[in-house]
């Protein structure tokens, strides 16, 4: 695990149905905690960008660019939103992710370092540099 990323860390929120079994008061309480969490990160200068995602979407795949419906909101793997954080280490990003108010209700948070360059582009650049040497 690479401990630092100068490009930040992405928190991907998965499990878009975490609130379905809760009362409206419980959802209101958790969202109040979520908004306080977000404000604290913003005020501390750690939040670069954030957004929820709509449930509907499409997937484009294959050589022909086939389009299909999905991902499906019912899926535990569906991404419901993201935070882009400006923090120096994976450890700090993980600590922030652990503070997510909806974790106890089944939401999961994937933490990924943002790469400085697409791995395929890096490989192509290195191959080009090697061939010129």
Residue ranges and their predicted role:
Residues 1-133:
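Conserved, structured core segments of small domains
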């Amino acid at each position: 695990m690479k401990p630092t990323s100068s490009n930040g860390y992405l928190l991907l929120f998965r499990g878009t149905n975490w609130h379905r079994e809760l009362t409206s008061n419980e959802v209101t309480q958790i969202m109040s905690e979520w908004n306080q969490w977000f404000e604290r990160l913003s005020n501390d200068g750690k939040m670069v960008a954030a957004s929820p995602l709509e449930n509907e979407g499409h997937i484009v795949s294959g050589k022909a660019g086939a389009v299909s419906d999905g991902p499906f909101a019912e899926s535990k793997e569906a991404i419901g939103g993201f935070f882009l954080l400006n923090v120096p280490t994976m450890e700090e990003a993980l600590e922030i992710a652990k503070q997510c108010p909806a974790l106890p209700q089944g939401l999961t948070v994937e933490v990924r370092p943002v790469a400085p360059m697409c791995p395929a582009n890096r490989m192509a650049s290195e191959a080009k540099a090697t061939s010129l040497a």
